[in-house]
Curated annotation (Swiss-Prot):
Residues 88-130, 147-165 have a biased composition (Pro residues). InterPro entries: Matrin/U1-C_Znf_C2H2, Matrin/U1-like-C_Znf_C2H2, U1-CZ_Znf_C2H2, U1_snRNP-C, Znf_C2H2_sf. The keyword Ion transport does not apply. One of its GO terms (cellular component) is U2-type prespliceosome. Component of the spliceosomal U1 snRNP, which is essential for recognition of the pre-mRNA 5' splice-site and the subsequent assembly of the spliceosome. U1-C is directly involved in initial 5' splice-site recognition for both constitutive and regulated alternative splicing. The interaction with the 5' splice-site seems to precede base-pairing between the pre-mRNA and the U1 snRNA. Stimulates commitment or early (E) complex formation by stabilizing the base pairing of the 5' end of the U1 snRNA and the 5' splice-site region. It comes from Cryptococcus neoformans var. neoformans serotype D (strain JEC21 / ATCC MYA-565) (Filobasidiella neoformans). Belongs to the U1 small nuclear ribonucleoprotein C family. This is U1 small nuclear ribonucleoprotein C. Residues 166-200 have a biased composition (Low complexity). A zinc finger (Matrin-type) spans 4-36.
Length: 220
């Protein structure tokens, strides 16, 4: 372990860390030694020395901030992440940051499973068919064509009536009740009681309500 040497106190610190340096610099003996050292120098020499120390401190502080945390001096005040156990360290400049995995988190899976040999298809994909594999296939099925759909063998719903065919395709005849009704125009049909044809005679009592021209046509 390296040791830090203090020029003002002329001693070596036990630990070379930022916390140990701060504790030593804030001590009473170190402050008194620094005051005595600058008091023994001349005014101009002391001022130039102070300016050099300030310049070196500012340039060194900027360099410390621009450096990666793992390359800084010690761990603790300037590099708190290096003191945490299990932390992989900061990424290099230009890379994405990484975080330590939490307990119970599965590792990251690759996007594709590794193949057994270079150029071989993945285990989940079937191998490609040769070019002449469609020679013995059924007609209509070849390379690039989709197989036909299976026939619909599902039974109809038991609660639904059977499908009725369209008009003109095996429709049953109209019931006899519909034929027994009157014609659309309201004219009586042949075979009903109280009807007559033009060749028959006009019933008795029917001339009063018939037009004269109609009677002449009937031979009255």
């Amino acid at each position: 372990m390296g040791k830090y040497y203090c020029d003002y106190c002329d001693i070596y610190l036990t630990h070379d860390s930022m916390n140990a340096r701060k504790a030593h610099n804030s001590g009473r003996n170190h402050v008194a030694n620094v005051r005595d050292y600058f008091a023994g120098l001349g005014g101009n020499q002391a001022q130039s020395l102070i300016d050099q120390i300030i310049q070196q401190h500012e340039s060194g502080g900027r360099n410390q901030m621009m450096m990666a945390p793992s390359m800084r001096l010690g761990a603790g005040f300037m590099n708190p992440l290096a003191t945490q156990p299990g932390y992989p360290g900061p990424p290099p400049p230009g890379a994405f940051p990484t975080f330590p995995p939490t307990a119970g988190t599965p590792p990251f899976r690759p996007p594709f499973p590794p193949s057994s040999a270079p150029g071989a298809p993945p285990p989940t994909m079937p191998p490609f068919l040769p070019p002449n594999a469609s020679a013995g296939a059924a007609p209509g099925i070849g390379m690039g064509s989709t197989p036909p759909f299976p026939p619909n063998t599902a039974s109809p719903n038991p609660g639904m009536p059977p499908f009725r065919p369209p008009m003109g395709m095996g429709m049953p005849p109209a019931p006899a009740q519909a034929q027994a009704q009157g014609s659309p125009m309201g004219m009586p049909q042949q075979g009903q009681q109280g009807t007559f044809t033009p060749t028959q005679e006009v019933p008795q009592g029917a001339g009063a309500g018939i037009h004269p021209d109609r009677l002449r046509m009937l031979g009255q």
